[in-house]
Amino acid sequence: MVIDPVTLSQELISFPSITPTDNGAISFLSDILSQYGFTCHILDFGDDTVTVRNLYAYRGTEEGPNLCFAGHTDVVKTGDLTKWKFDPFSGHIEDDILYGRGAVDMKSAICAFIAAVSRINFNEVPGSISFLISGDEEGDHFQYGTPSVLKWLNENNHKIDYCIIGEPTSKSFLGDTIKVGRRGSVHFKIICNGIQGHVAYPHFAENPIDNMVSILYKICNTTFDTGNEYFQPSNCEIVSVDTGNTSKNVIPDTIVAHINIRYNNIHTAESLFDIINNICAQVTPKYQLLQSVSGEPFFNQPNQYSDMLSSAIKKVTGQDAIASTSGGVSDSRFIKNVCPVIEFGLKNETAHKIDEHVPVKEIYQLADIYTEFIKQFFNLSTT
């Protein structure tokens, strides 16, 4: 029996799986996939404060290649419910548009791939198809999602040969963009120290704000690079600056700034640390610099599989897709250490927004694209 991807999307959206809470979404998918012959493993990882529920499901033979679809069932918070046209967890359809939290990012893509798989004759598949579904990609406990599942796969001798992630990569229209890599993301915490004092007696104090202003000015006027063929120039943004001082007549003794750099493969987090550290040292010796790396940049050279995906998109939509490395980090930063990975999904315009929505036509088209890609991947009949 072939699955309707829109109906399935409505059902999956109805689970309020706000990260890292699952609320039954993973078990629902496990039940569906089990009905279609998949061996399903529900995997719980976490610590004393949180448990993240994940799913790994597979079907086929171990003798051929494994094509994995990766995604996440967790969604971001809804925001002000009174601003939504419809209940964000109702899966409401109005004027052929599906509304709901996760409609774009990325429950509909999961359902589209499941629908695609339901159309495949597994007797003809010379390999296997799998699903790696994380319960926390959006939140702070992502380490208990995809990274933990990948570790489990390795420990239990499960292989993945190629992975497609259903992140919403499209911009203006479905199929205009596929992601063949991602920029890196590094966060810096800069602390400048001074001497607290009365604003009327600055000679008895040392204002750390002066040094921080100089440091941030130098950072903002630094050209880290000019980009390359596949990546845009690295970009730095000041996220916050704070002294924690609520008094109007006191010079603070400390100021803290947070900056984020999205960087290309010309740099590493280590090389950027050296640049920022050097700038701070030029201004003052009274500083501390702390670094947190969300992911290093990576790039997958175009290959036969990305060509297959482009061909599938062209066949269904008539459009030519471009390969891109723009946007934020995703779970591809973990999966790329295991196998080649590509990302393709719906338009991202309303992701994380009030009234997140997608035309139902595009969900059907996405399922058609995924179906065509699977057939080309395994060299199945495309008639």
Curated annotation (Swiss-Prot):
The active site is at D74, E137. Transmembrane segments: none annotated. Catalyzes the hydrolysis of N-succinyl-L,L-diaminopimelic acid (SDAP), forming succinate and LL-2,6-diaminopimelate (DAP), an intermediate involved in the bacterial biosynthesis of lysine and meso-diaminopimelic acid, an essential component of bacterial cell walls. InterPro entries: ArgE/DapE_CS (IPR001261), Bact_exopeptidase_dim_dom (IPR036264), DapE_proteobac (IPR005941), Peptidase_M20 (IPR002933), Peptidase_M20_dimer (IPR011650), Peptidase_M20A (IPR050072). Zn(2+) 2 binds at D105, E138, H352. Binds 2 Zn(2+) or Co(2+) ions per subunit. This is Succinyl-diaminopimelate desuccinylase. It catalyses: N-succinyl-(2S,6S)-2,6-diaminopimelate + H2O = (2S,6S)-2,6-diaminopimelate + succinate. The lineage of its organism: Bacteria, Pseudomonadati, Pseudomonadota, Alphaproteobacteria, Rickettsiales. PROSITE patterns: ARGE_DAPE_CPG2_2. Coiled coil: none annotated. Belongs to the peptidase M20A family. DapE subfamily. Pfam families: M20_dimer, Peptidase_M20. Pathway: Amino-acid biosynthesis; L-lysine biosynthesis via DAP pathway; LL-2,6-diaminopimelate from (S)-tetrahydrodipicolinate (succinylase route): step 3/3. Its cofactor is Zn(2+); Co(2+). PANTHER family: ACETYLORNITHINE DEACETYLASE, N-ACETYL-L-CITRULLINE DEACETYLASE.
